[in-house]
UniProtKB/Swiss-Prot annotation:
Chain positions of site Influences the redox potential of the prosthetic heme and FAD groups: 84, 384
Role summary: Is involved in NO detoxification in an aerobic process, termed nitric oxide dioxygenase (NOD) reaction that utilizes O(2) and NAD(P)H to convert NO to nitrate, which protects the bacterium from various noxious nitrogen compounds. Therefore, plays a central role in the inducible response to nitrosative stress.
Organism annotation: Vibrio cholerae serotype O1 (strain ATCC 39315 / El Tor Inaba N16961)
One GO CC annotation: cytoplasm
Organism domain of life: Bacteria
Record-listed E.C. numbers: 1.14.12.17
Binding positions (FAD): 190, 206-209, 385-388
Gene that this sequence comes from: hmp
KW NADP (keyword) present: yes
Feature type site, description Involved in heme-bound ligand stabilization and O-O bond activation: 29
Protein name, entry field: Flavohemoprotein
Comment on bound cofactor: Binds 1 heme b (iron(II)-protoporphyrin IX) group per subunit.
Active-site residues, record numbering mapped to chain: 95 (charge relay system), 137 (charge relay system)
Length: 394
């Protein structure tokens, strides 16, 4: 049971956490994977190499410590993380393993400060939060299993179509091998896909945004070939592009995600860059089915060859009479602006519009800064980060 004394002790350890920084979570992951290598089948090891996951986990732990006396402030974070966990098929027993290694990490990095009262407080705090996640994730699993076309664990799907969308993005249309219905989803959500690439010692699970409106029959994901020309090419994305063919099978976990279009009587502005167009495409198709008016689509990429869904989007926008503006950073073209996206030059629904963002973190930070400067209410800015979460604005 989490007591007031525990809360007081946790808050007193905040300076210790802040002084340790992400080194704490780096040590935690190294320890956990050393003792429990089977978890490498679940965690994205690429994010371990880049350090993004360590930073994201540290920020989550620090936020929990700071808000442990006001857990309502963490509601949105809990929902986001719970959805992501279900796309990895996280189970209650995993929390026991994580808790053990987190507590041992604190003991090893701060042996003098990790007194018995501190250990008891962090043990109570961790397992209190773990139960919050277990309960929420259990509810999500049950809800999806009981819904039409739903399922609980992995389900086998077959690649029905494979379509090149741009220089680095290819779409895969996936249908269930059992011939049954598929679970509906909200436009903007993602699915977890599990594969075992050639040369990999582990099963690999990745999340990809669904890029078409829900129809109860099939899913479409649109995958960017990551790290082209780099020393660290995307393991799963390259495997999907190079090896997975029409007729091949993959395992999917049910649609998840707390970023999605919410129907309101407001104008809608969709802003994306690069492969960030994928969830926006699902939203666009959904808005078209609703005959939604007052939609603005803003998109940026490097060049025409990297313009994902160019024709598909143009057709939708022309049919619906919506507004579109595109920027190419490296070249000019008809009806396309060159350079960086400049929102002040456009007529936008600043006072009442809902703004949905997706793309590289630097791009979204740049856009959010502009939106806030223009007077857009922060509550009307919604965004999706591919990979470990990051804050875009204070």
């Amino acid at each position: 049971m989490l007591t007031q004394e525990h809360i007081n002790i946790i808050k007193s350890t905040i300076p210790l956490l802040e002084s340790a920084g992400p080194a704490l979570t780096q040590h935690f992951y190294q320890r956990m994977f050393s003792h429990n290598p089977e978890l490498k089948h679940i965690f994205n090891m690429t994010h371990q190499k880049t350090g993004r996951q360590s930073v994201a986990l540290f920020e989550a732990i620090a936020a929990y410590a700071k808000h442990i006396d006001n857990l309502a402030a963490l509601t949105s974070a809990v929902e986001r993380i719970a959805h992501k966990h279900t796309s990895f098929n996280i189970q209650p027993e995993h929390y026991q393993i994580v808790g053990h290694h987190l507590l041992e990490t604190l003991r090893e990095l701060a042996p003098d400060a990790f007194t018995q009262p501190v250990e008891e407080a962090w043990t109570a705090a961790y397992f209190f939060l773990a139960q919050v996640f277990i309960d929420r994730e259990g509810a999500l699993y049950l809800e999806r299993k009981q819904a039409l076309g739903g399922w609980r664990d992995g389900r086998t799907f077959v690649v029905r179509e494979k379509q090149v969308e741009s220089a680095y993005v290819t779409s895969f249309v996936l249908v269930p091998a059992d011939g049954g219905a598929v679970l509906d989803y909200q436009p903007g959500q993602y699915i977890g896909i599990e594969v075992t690439p050639e040369g990999s010692d582990y099963r690999e699970i990745r999340q990809y945004s669904l890029s078409h409106a829900s129809n109860g029959r099939e899913y479409r994901i649109s995958v960017k070939r990551e790290g082209v020309g780099s020393d660290n090419p995307g393991l799963v994305s390259h495997y999907l592009h190079n090896n997975v063919k029409v007729g091949d099978s993959v395992k999917l976990y049910a649609p998840a995600g707390d970023f999605f279009y919410v129907e309101r009587e407001r104008p809608v502005v969709l802003i994306s860059a690069g492969v960030g167009a994928t969830p926006m495409q699902a939203i666009l198709h959904t808005l078209a089915k609703q005959n939604k008016s007052g939609v603005t689509y803003l998109y940026a990429c490097n060049s025409a060859k990297e313009h994902t869904f160019a024709q598909e989007t143009a057709q939708l926008i022309a049919q619906q009479g919506w507004m579109q503006q595109v920027w190419y950073r490296d070249e000019s073209a008809d009806d396309v602006l060159q350079g960086e996206m400049q929102l002040a030059e456009l007529i936008l629904p600043i006072e009442d519009g809902d703004f949905y963002l997706c793309g590289p973190i630097g791009f979204m930070q740049y856009v959010v800064k502009q939106l806030l400067a223009l007077g857009v209410d922060k509550a009307r800015i919604h965004y999706e980060v591919f990979g470990p979460h990051a804050q875009l604005a204070a």
